[in-house]
Amino acid sequence: MLQSKLINGFGILKAIGQVKLLNKRIPAYCEWEITHYCNMSCAWCATLTPERNTADDLSSEKALDIIEQLSDLGTQMIHFSGGEPMLRKDLHLLITLAKQKNMMVALTTNGSASSEAMERVLHADMIRVSIDGTERYMEPTSFSFQP
């Protein structure tokens, strides 16, 4: 029951219903790793690779075009993740366009961005800040991690 309320809170059930009513497949939800760049080195991170801070991100123009295409397809929600999405200087533009296209917008961040940077993205519908624990908790104790 709680799960239904949470899903309804993000409009996902509504989007799934629309997909079924339209009798065609559309990407109702898109999770987009908008950048591989990150300012942290968390041992458990799936994007912790040697090339993560050297890979090229899509240009602003291409990223905006993808949002336009997702909107044209009927996408209801877009979730920006990464790396650390707040490292993209154009993130507020991407969020603004998605909101203009009536998409719900979610963002996952490590919370290390400046207050000014956070203010530029406050119009997202959901901002999730990863808080993984204290420094002592974060130390691997039962396995060996080799980057």
Give the ranges of each region predicted by the language model:
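N-terminal pre-core extensions flanking Radical SAM catalytic domains
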Residues: 1-49
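A short, structure-level motif marking secondary-structure boundaries and short turns
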Residues: 15-17, 50-52, 78-80, 102
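Ser/Thr-centric signal marking residues that sit
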Residues: 35, 47, 81, 108-109
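Short, histidine-centered active-site or binding-site loop motifs used for metal coordination
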Residues: 48-51, 133-135
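Conserved catalytic-core motifs of eukaryotic protein kinase domains, centered on the activation segment
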Residues: 49, 54, 140
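Radical SAM/AdoMet-radical enzyme domain recognition
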Residues: 60-80, 88-147
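Conserved G/P- and acidic residue-centered "switch" motifs that form tight phosphate/ATP-binding loops
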Residues: 84
